[in-house]
């Protein structure tokens, strides 16, 4: 199951909620609640692998001045919470190879710019962008040492 993209879904929910309330600030609380329910409902579908994409937003850390990248979602609460709801959070990275051609990778662990994670422990920091290969790698039983 694929939801592409939860950023767009959140924007539609927020627009609907703003039209329903007199004070647009209340719409953000309703947005966070509805998106949490929707994301968890899809995430927890029995017997299904669920993939959700999200726009990427460039942010500047006011304390350190560092440039950070994270999910682009309306409302601070939703953007801050979303990564906690998933076992796997990847960033699609595009870098140039030695010949200057673009190469795509999925980053699976955090660094100074991207907040990523891999709870499976089965992935390298950068993986080729094949979700089928990544799913197979995660499902592969761990090697056990003979005693």
Predicted regions located by residue number:
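P-loop NTPase motor core
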Residues: 3-80
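Conserved GTP-binding G-domain of TRAFAC-class P-loop NTPases and closely related GTPase folds
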Residues: 58-147
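P-loop NTPase motor domains
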Residues: 1-2, 8-13, 119, 130, ...
């Amino acid at each position: 199951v694929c939801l592409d993209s939860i950023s767009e879904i959140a924007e539609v929910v927020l627009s609907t909620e703003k039209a329903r309330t007199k004070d647009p600030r209340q719409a953000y609380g309703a947005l966070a609640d509805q998106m949490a329910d929707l994301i968890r409902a899809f995430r927890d579908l029995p017997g299904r692998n669920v993939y959700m994409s999200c726009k990427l937003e460039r942010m500047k850390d006011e304390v350190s001045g560092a440039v950070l990248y994270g999910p682009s979602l309306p409302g601070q609460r939703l953007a801050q919470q979303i990564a906690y709801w998933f076992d796997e959070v990847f960033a699609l990275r595009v870098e140039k190879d030695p010949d200057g051609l673009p190469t795509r990778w999925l980053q699976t662990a955090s660094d100074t710019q991207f907040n990523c994670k891999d709870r499976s422990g089965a992935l390298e920091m950068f993986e080729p962008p094949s979700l089928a290969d990544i799913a197979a790698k995660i499902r592969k039983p761990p090697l056990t040492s003979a005693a």
